[in-house]
């Protein structure tokens, strides 16, 4: 018996909810599946990751003050079919890779883009094992 069954969602706090949701939708293709206000007054948006059950929960709690991304929180990673094709998609949106593409010793290729609020996104093109 496993202790947990699966990862359900990851929560990120942001200053500009609509700008962040637009980025994840337009750039990465995530779908907004739920939006509501919590009893404590924060606004919540759940985004579905394509091809999986995992979600990203984006929250904005204005009374909490400006968001400061912790230096140790480095990135979210998403798999893509082709870094070259994804770079063309990004170019159409006026976005460039902030780092990479780079190839690991196992042949996996990866690159990074900057997301709103100081978060970073890793894009991985797998080759064989990760």
Could you say what each language-model-derived stretch is?
Residues 41, 72, 107:
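Exposed loop/turn and edge beta-strand positions of beta-sandwich/beta-sheet ligand-binding modules
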Residues 11-53:
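Core segments of cupin and vicinal oxygen chelate
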Residues 51-55, 63-65, 83-85:
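Short, charged/polar surface micro-motifs in flexible loops or helix N-caps
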Residues 1-19, 73-76, 127-130:
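N-terminal beta-strand motif that seeds the catalytic metal site of vicinal oxygen chelate
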Residues 16-17, 80-84:
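Helix N-cap motif at beta-to-alpha junctions
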Residues 1-3, 35-36, 46, 87-130:
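Vicinal oxygen chelate
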């Amino acid at each position: 018996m496993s202790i947990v069954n699966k990862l359900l969602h990851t929560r990120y706090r942001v200053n500009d909810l609509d700008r962040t949701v637009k980025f994840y939708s337009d750039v990465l293709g995530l779908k907004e599946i739920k939006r509501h206000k919590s009893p404590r007054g924060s606004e919540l948006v759940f985004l579905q990751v394509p091809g999986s059950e995992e979600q990203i929960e984006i929250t904005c709690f204005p009374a909490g003050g400006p968001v400061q991304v912790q230096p140790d929180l480095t990135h979210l990673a998403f798999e893509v079919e082709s870094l070259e094709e994804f770079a063309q998609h990004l170019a159409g949106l006026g976005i460039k890779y902030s780092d990479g593409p780079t190839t690991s010793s196992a042949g996996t290729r990866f690159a990074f883009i900057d997301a709103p609020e100081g978060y970073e996104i890793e894009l991985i093109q797998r080759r064989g094992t990760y």
